């Protein structure tokens, strides 16, 4: 499978609507003797008073081809993000439904729900998630951002264990003499209905710089 070439064709188009900004994304991938994938996503957004509302539905299909070296595959995933931004806050509800087979993503992620540890990918899985993010710039704390992100992952009883994941993240981007430096801390708790629960802690240090002029 690793030696199979991948062919990709994509397009993005901004529709000429003023009241509701609309961006259409369409991609098709072909991996010989593995699978074909088609992915479509539409981004809608509009401002009502001081609130920005947005809706991002998406649909993905995957079907094995040729020698099926990645295994038999015939599945889909659809879902959406529905949210609102106001005064530095961004609240989003996310929903995803996956078809009969687990989604295969060897080169990237087009899944609807992507959390710190898990993502919407299992066969016959339904995911409901809620994310609350806040940019503290409105409070005079430039560069400070945080979010809490909860997801509930459910599958049929004979397909595996239901579980939930809770994420917490805080990040800070420095300015002035330390411009380009960023710190980030993330913490996740995963709670399985059947199985061992665990926590995941991550720390990041980033530094962005340019070479030359």
Each predicted region: which residue ranges?
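A C-terminal functional module that forms or caps the active site or interfaces directly
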Residues: 137-182
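Transmembrane beta-barrel domains of Gram-negative outer membranes and organellar outer membranes
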Residues: 186, 190-191
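Internal metal/ion-chelating core segments
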Residues: 1-44
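Outer-membrane beta-barrel translocator domains and adjoining extracellular loop/strand segments
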Residues: 1, 36-41, 64-74, 103-108, ...
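Residues that define the transmembrane beta-barrel architecture of outer-membrane proteins
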Residues: 3-7, 34-38, 51, 74-78, ...
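Outer-membrane beta-barrel "beta-signal"
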Residues: 8-9, 130, 168, 172, ...
């Amino acid at each position: 499978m690793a030696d199979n070439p991948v062919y990709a064709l994509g397009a993005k188009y901004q529709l000429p609507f003023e009241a509701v900004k609309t961006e259409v994304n369409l991609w098709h991938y072909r991996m010989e003797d593995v699978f074909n994938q088609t992915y479509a996503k539409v981004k809608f957004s509009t401002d009502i008073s001081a609130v920005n509302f947005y809706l991002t539905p998406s649909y993905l299909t995957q079907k094995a081809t040729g020698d099926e070296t990645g295994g038999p595959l015939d599945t889909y995933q659809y879902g959406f993000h529905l949210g609102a931004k106001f005064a530095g806050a961004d609240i989003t509800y996310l929903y995803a439904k996956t078809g009969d087979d687990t989604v295969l993503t060897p080169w990237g992620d087009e899944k609807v729900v992507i959390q710190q540890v898990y993502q919407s990918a299992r066969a016959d899985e339904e995911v409901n998630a809620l994310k609350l993010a806040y940019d503290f710039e409105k409070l005079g704390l430039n560069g400070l951002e945080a979010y809490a992100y909860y997801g509930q992952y459910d599958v049929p009883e004979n397909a595996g264990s239901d579980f939930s994941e809770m994420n917490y993240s805080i990040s800070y981007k420095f300015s002035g003499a330390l411009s380009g430096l960023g710190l980030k801390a993330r913490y996740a708790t995963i709670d399985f209905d059947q199985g061992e629960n665990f926590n995941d802690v991550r720390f990041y240090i980033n530094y962005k710089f340019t070479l030359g002029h």
